[in-house]
Amino acid sequence: MDVKKVVLAYSGGLDTSIILKWLIESYGCEVVAFSADLGQAEELDGLEAKALATGAVKARIVDLREEFVRDFVFPAFRANAIYEGQYLLGTSIARPLIAKAQIRIAEEEDADAVSHGATGKGNDQVRFELTYIALNPAIKIIAPWREWDLKSRSDLVEFARRHGIPIPVTKEKPYSSDRNMLHISYEGGILEDPWLEPDPAMFTLSVAPEEAPDAPEFVEIDFERGNPVAVNGERLSPAQLLTRLNALGGRHGIGRVDLVESRFVGMKSRGVYETPGGTIMRTAHHAVESVTMDRELMFLRDSLVPQYSRLIYNGFWYSPEMRLLQNTMDLAQENVYGTAKLKLYKGNCVVIGRRSDRSLYQPSFATFEEDDVYRQDDATGFIRLHGLRLQIESLVRGKSR
């Protein structure tokens, strides 16, 4: 494959630093190192200088934090997306944005190829490449882990030494991690034993629930059309709001999940996740929905959530079926305005109140006291009609005995 210039999704770790040098050596091409700022904090320090020192002709770090939360996290949370009942899709939802920005930079830099550092066994290779194909079918794709003959950690270290690529002198973590504004994930290494409890020192965004404050903290979150817009009455931008909720949740040990998930490529893998702000946001969203969404609308929407979540997990963010589902999910949120009040305490996020000017909860109908709006004897015919098919089935079954 003839390649003149490649835009590499560059994290600054040993793997993508080696890939940068390998691309130059294997393809004789120029490499532009692209890094997406999704809230990795200090992980971005020194990234540009490191990329240039490794051989990149240019290094670009793009702040995508607001776009990430506004256009990717919020749509997923409007839909109550969750994979296999536990995973809030923190890594999955970030990949299409990184790949989208990578394609944009490739077009700006007149590059004819893109490259990523995802392995041939994981989900990320699919997520990156499906986005590349959807947004620029003509772009060439280089996936080094599926091409090169570097098969082990020792092979990578030897390649780095041979090419003068700095190898971290700090003790290697016995697991891998991936961080953005929504979550941090941990997998591999010692976590591959699903019976082994994670090291408490591993966690970054949250304190252990048993070490959280002994007094609860209360928070109110306002929603408009299913989007959180304010915390305790203060309106915030999407990224600011998620940052605030991360701090609150982390302080109280909220949002830790240890699970085994089904990868798109076929195998199961263990993942440990911290999603403090997202957990609060999801709980509050459910609370406001409970008083503002029609029952049948909610049932229908809920039936679509598993498929919607699988599309995100499997990398089909830019597919026609995702556009259809997103439009449907957003239509279901037209009436979701209101405020949820939560109590945060030692790993627990508990709804203690909800209110809305558009509330479908009407005390005059729901009261257990005497009322003038609901005729209890109407229930007799209601029950008879709904029981008719059961009555017929029982009669037929009795005849067949």
Swiss-Prot record:
InterPro entries: Arginosuc_syn_C, Arginosuc_syn_N, Arginosuc_synth, Arginosuc_synth_CS, Arginosuc_synth_type_1_subfam, AS_cat/multimer_dom_body, Rossmann-like_a/b/a_fold
Residues that hold L-citrulline according to the record: Y87, S92, N123, R127, S176, S185, E261, Y273
Record-listed L-aspartate binding positions: T119, N123, D124
EC number: 6.3.4.5
Organism in which the protein naturally occurs: Syntrophobacter fumaroxidans (strain DSM 10017 / MPOB)
Root EC class: ligase
Encoding gene (name): argG
Protein name: Argininosuccinate synthase
Reaction(s) the record says it catalyses: L-citrulline + L-aspartate + ATP = 2-(N(omega)-L-arginino)succinate + AMP + diphosphate + H(+)
UniProt cross-references to CDD domains, sorted A to Z: ASS (cd01999)
One of the Pfam families matching this protein, by short name: Arginosuc_syn_C
Protein family membership: Belongs to the argininosuccinate synthase family. Type 1 subfamily.
Pathway field: Amino-acid biosynthesis; L-arginine biosynthesis; L-arginine from L-ornithine and carbamoyl phosphate: step 2/3
Domain of life: Bacteria
